[in-house]
A protein has these predicted regions:
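Cytosolic juxtamembrane amphipathic/interface segments immediately preceding
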Residues: 18-36, 100-104
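Membrane-interface alpha-helices at helix entry/exit sites of multi-pass transporters
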Residues: 103-112
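Conserved small/polar residues in nucleotide/adenosyl-binding loops
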Residues: 130-132
């Protein structure tokens, strides 16, 4: 007979933490090239989502309408497997504390993902400036 906990559709807290630790461990070993590419696209997607949310809010005359659009940027980043430095700020220290990564790998990841995010958002900002 199976237990009722195994029939539920939710993830237990300890399973969630284990998944986060595993994700942090995997992220700490990604190559610099992939960190920059994923970080760039992540920053660009978030920048485009911000531009779209602001445009919809202003053009519609209902600023709150943009708040429904912006989360699609975050969802896209997750679904496409991109790297956003704020998420890595949470996942990688957990992997270090669990012994799945090192602080040097964590700082390396943060640095390259931040650079990629910055370049992606700067790219969208330049395109927006050219468009104006």
């Amino acid at each position: 007979m199976t237990s009722s906990a195994s029939q539920m559709d939710y993830v237990l807290p300890n399973e969630l933490v284990d998944g986060m630790i595993a994700a942090g461990g995997k992220k700490s070993s990604v190559s610099v090239k992939n960190l920059l590419i994923r970080g760039f696209y992540s920053g660009a997607i978030l920048g485009l989502a911000t531009c779209l949310a602001i445009t919809i809010g202003i053009q519609s005359g209902m600023p709150w309408l943009g708040s429904f659009i912006f989360p699609f940027g975050f969802a896209s980043i997750v679904l496409f497997g991109m790297e956003l430095v704020t998420g890595n700020f949470a996942l990688l220290p957990m992997a270090v504390w669990a012994g799945k990564s090192s602080w040097s790998a964590t700082v390396r990841n943060w640095l390259w993902v931040w650079i990629g995010n910055f370049l992606g958002t700067a790219f969208v900002a330049v395109l927006s400036l050219i468009h104006i």
